[in-house]
Regions:
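Short acidic DE-rich linear segments
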Residues: 143-146
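Short histidine
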Residues: 7, 28-32
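Flexible, glycine-rich loop/tail regions that form catalytic "lids" or insertion modules at the edges
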Residues: 21, 32-70, 81-83, 107, ...
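Long amphipathic alpha-helices with heptad-repeat character
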Residues: 122-137
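Intrinsically disordered, low-structural-confidence terminal and linker regions
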Residues: 1-20
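Amphipathic alpha-helical packing elements
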Residues: 74-109
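Short linear, low-complexity motifs centered on an aromatic residue
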Residues: 101-123
Length: 146
């Protein structure tokens, strides 16, 4: 089955220009500036959720995987508003969504390294895992009542 391009690169270019952002259709790395994240957050956060810009920025960088990063999984063509809405939906589920995801992704990386018998990578990823778990534990603690 031949699927259409749902969001064109021209549309991504148009919206980026309108918002004063760099052209996200040309992004090679999933890297978003704090200024870009703040601009997009202001547009998509219509219900006024208390979302730290840094958390939203992390979400944007993760959710760009729904764009041009994987051509066979491209849904958004890196459209900044659609990507922002994906982030918003996940943060509505739980505000620590991306901290939890970071832990899971590192655990997956550790398994890959174990299967590849790459002990150096296992060690470095395990150190990353400890840091990610600490950040998640802190986020959970902050959500709990005193």
């Amino acid at each position: 089955m031949n699927l259409p391009e749902y969001i064109s690169k021209d549309e991504v270019k148009r919206i980026c220009k309108e918002l004063g952002l760099r052209d996200w259709s040309k992004l090679k790395e999933a890297s978003v500036t704090e200024k870009e994240a703040a601009e997009i957050l202001q547009i998509v956060n219509t219900k006024g959720m208390d979302i730290p810009v840094e958390d939203f920025k992390q979400g944007l960088e993760v959710e760009l995987e729904h764009g041009t990063r994987y051509d066979d999984a491209n849904v958004t063509n890196n459209h900044p508003i659609l990507t922002g809405k994906i982030v918003l939906a996940h943060l509505k589920e739980t505000m620590d969504y991306y901290k939890r995801l970071e832990v899971v992704e590192i655990e997956g990386d550790i398994l890959k390294a174990v299967l590849a018998k790459d002990l150096k990578k296992v060690e470095s990823k395990y150190k990353e895992l400890v840091q990610a778990q600490q950040l998640l534990a802190k986020a959970i603690k902050e959500q709990l009542p005193e």
